[in-house]
Amino acid sequence: MAPLHFTILILFSFVIVVSSSSFTPPRHPFDPLTETELKLVRTIINKSYPVGPNHKFTFQYVGLNEPNKSLVLSWYSSPNHTIKPPPRQAFVIARDNGKTREIVLDFSSRAIVSDKIHVGNGYPMLSNDEQEASTELVVKFKPFIDSVAKRGLNVSEIVFTTSTIGWYGETKAEAERVIRLMPFYLDGTVNMYLRPIEGMTIIVNLDEMKVSEFKDRSVVTMPIANGTEYRISKLNPPFGPTLHNAVLLQPDGPGFKVDGHIVRWANWEFHISFDVRAGIVISLASLFDTDVNKYRQVLYKGHLSEMFIPYMDPSDDWYFITYLDCGDFGCGQCAVSLQPYTDCPAGAVFMDGIFAGQDGTPAKIPKVMCIFEKYAGDIMWRHTEAEIPNLEITEVRPDVSLVARIVTTVGNYDYIVDYEFKPSGSIKMGVGLTGVLEVKPVEYIHTSEIKLGEDIHGTIVADNTVGVNHDHFVTFRLHLDIDGTENSFVRNELVTTRSPKSVNTPRKTYWTTKPKTAKTEAEARVKLGLKAEELVVVNPNRKTKHGNEVGYRLLHGSAAGPLLAQDDFPQIRAAFTNYNVWITPYNRSEVWAGGLYADRSQGDDTLAVWSQRNRKIEKEDIVMWYTVGFHHVPSQEDYPTMPTLSGGFELRPTNFFERNPVLKTKPVKVTTARKCTPKND
């Protein structure tokens, strides 16, 4: 167990970069596919499906095929991992001449072991290459060029973003694999999203790579470029507010160690990897218990499963904007390189992300993940005792946590996703929303100009600019193993109770707890905020010395849920947001809450559908699904860029330990450098 390094000193700064391509051969069953393995996948598949003028074959997803859990745990629990690890395989989703093909490839035999055609609804996530190709196609399309000229605009100043179009009752045959291109105008700004060119419909068929529909419906006045700049080098005084420079350093070095993809810090050990769809994946998170002198299981696997982003404008230019970001675009594929000292503090360790491009060639996102210790001035625990005569006692421990971070930029929004581990045993998942609003042009510059009864579907945030109302629903898949694989879900209701007449008390009421163990999936669906209850995953086979079942409690954040009608097409596809919390029995194929094929899906392969089987979940290997929700009514402070809006939740040990696990954490040793005394004004 790595000790906590609490000595703090301001000295110098450093960052460490660990390249994923160096992890060859993999030493862990959950290690992401290496560059060498991705090249092997490409070689083997290209031999089976030769690409030519009449045979179009593209890689849409390549990732680690989920290994058998029992084999993983046997390997993990063996002394020094001496048992042979599970077979290492790749899972590939490809487009093959207009069909979606699912391929499993085994690395030891260097052979394809499974190959089938997907016959259901929906399409795989878009590749970067085909999105770029679609934009290059449109700028050469004469009807589009003519429409641009009609508006008096310069084609060279136009940029595009691509949008999936969802599903609105079309049959499978009608629901072609198409995207809609949304044009924006630069001409004096780089903040493209604040200058939309509306009134045009541009649809591109991705399989045929041609413009399948083009309409120029109307000419809409664009917002001006003035006031949209956000680059500090281009902004003019006055600046502010002024923040003083600071560097936090540990003279003993970081308190965590990264060995391949294994991270060890304080009393935690976990595996971290990168997936092109999920982003960060945390696996086999275990907590060292000094009372029993061993690591205890907490989280088998946790990651982002899906994001649902519906906008609240039913007009032709907006109704289709109901993204399923991870399934449509890939939350890992859209992840960006993190900036040392700003995205991540000094002392951070950075890791690259490797994934397969459309032709199967490995691509790399440098510094896509970072790991760092967080000193935020929080207090781990404290107490001042002044009630004892002639004695005053004060004990304080500053809090430190370990954060694994990724930032995924899906179009205009930047999502900061944090997995934060605390010495107390808690795991906090945080989501920060920042970036640029998606806006629409209007004729108004003041609210007094809005016609009586007119709904502008948002807020006037600048001249001729409305920030459109929308939601963000961020769903996490949390495969918990609380001290083992046999877990249950307990809904511990807090009930107001009348004081019994037999008790001599002036109190009329109090609250007490009424725990109920969910036996099936239906009993575990939770809409937060309807009643007071604690939600706990327990291991009924493990109890403390006082008889309490060991467990982890969900400390939820916002109770925001969907406001769309249940029969609205976007909500049918995103029915996994109907409840804030779901519990399902572990099924290796149930990974993506919005379905394996999200693009143009019809809602028939989602968490909501799987859960209709109402399977047994008591004393089973179970998975918790939790959705962080935001209703976003834009404000002027969100323009031209948006200050980070944060949400999240916490998994907190509940009777997991016999006592406070950080009781014996020693006070920090603080070393100060020069000029650390505040200046009095």
UniProtKB/Swiss-Prot annotation:
Modified residues (2',4',5'-topaquinone): 413
Binding site for Cu cation: 470, 472, 632
Binding-site residues, substrate: 323-334, 410-415
Induction (record text): Induced transiently by auxin (IAA). Induced by jasmonic acid (MeJA). Accumulates during dehydration recovery and treatment with putrescine (Put). Repressed by abscisic acid (ABA) and salicylic acid (SA). Triggered by wounding.
Tissue expression notes: Mostly expressed in stems, and, at lower levels, in flowers and leaves. Mainly detectable in stipules, hypocotyls and roots.
Pathway the protein takes part in: Amine and polyamine degradation; putrescine degradation
Pfam family, one: Cu_amine_oxid
Disulphide-bridged cysteine pairs: 344-370
Reaction catalyzed: a primary methyl amine + O2 + H2O = an aldehyde + H2O2 + NH4(+)
Subcellular location per the Swiss-Prot or TrEMBL entry: Peroxisome
The protein's role, per its UniProt record: Copper amine oxidase that can use putrescine and spermidine as substrates. Involved in putrescine catabolism in peroxisomes.
Family: Belongs to the copper/topaquinone oxidase family.
Protein name: Amine oxidase [copper-containing] alpha 3, peroxisomal
Organism field: Arabidopsis thaliana
Lineage of the species this protein comes from: Eukaryota, Viridiplantae, Streptophyta, Embryophyta, Tracheophyta
Gene: CuAOalpha3
